[in-house]
A protein has these predicted regions:
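Conserved catalytic or regulatory cores that recognize and/or transform ribose-phosphate-containing ligands
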Residues: 1-109
């Protein structure tokens, strides 16, 4: 909590950009401080990835994965964007991390 506001980190496949944005708006209006992804690798931001050599791409993805774990550290809970029940390996890893660190886990579906 920050003051009276719960801090929520959004997790899920970045292919669900629209659902991320909807959840962010809804949770904000419910009085939550929302932490989200910085880039949508599967649903946009192609200009970031185009032209990156394989080594840079790998290091960037590893950095983003680690940064998202730090975002989970800052949160009271995570909210999983699991459209159609889909949870990929990265999201599953984030859920397991959140559970190990005592965070509440909620799901869109």
């Amino acid at each position: 909590m920050v003051g009276k506001y719960k801090v929520v980190t959004l997790c899920g496949s970045t292919r669900f950009k629209d659902q991320f944005m909807e959840a962010q708006k809804r949770l904000t209006l419910e009085g939550c401080i929302v932490i989200s992804v910085g880039l949508f690798g599967h649903a946009g931001d192609s200009e970031v990835w185009e032209g990156m050599d394989e080594g840079t791409l790998t290091r960037t993805k590893e950095m983003l994965d680690d940064m998202h774990k730090r975002k989970i550290d800052m949160a009271d809970e995570i909210f999983v964007i699991n459209v159609g029940g889909y949870i990929g390996s990265s999201t599953r890893s984030e859920i397991e991390y959140a559970q190990r660190t005592g965070k509440t886990v909620r799901y869109l579906e």
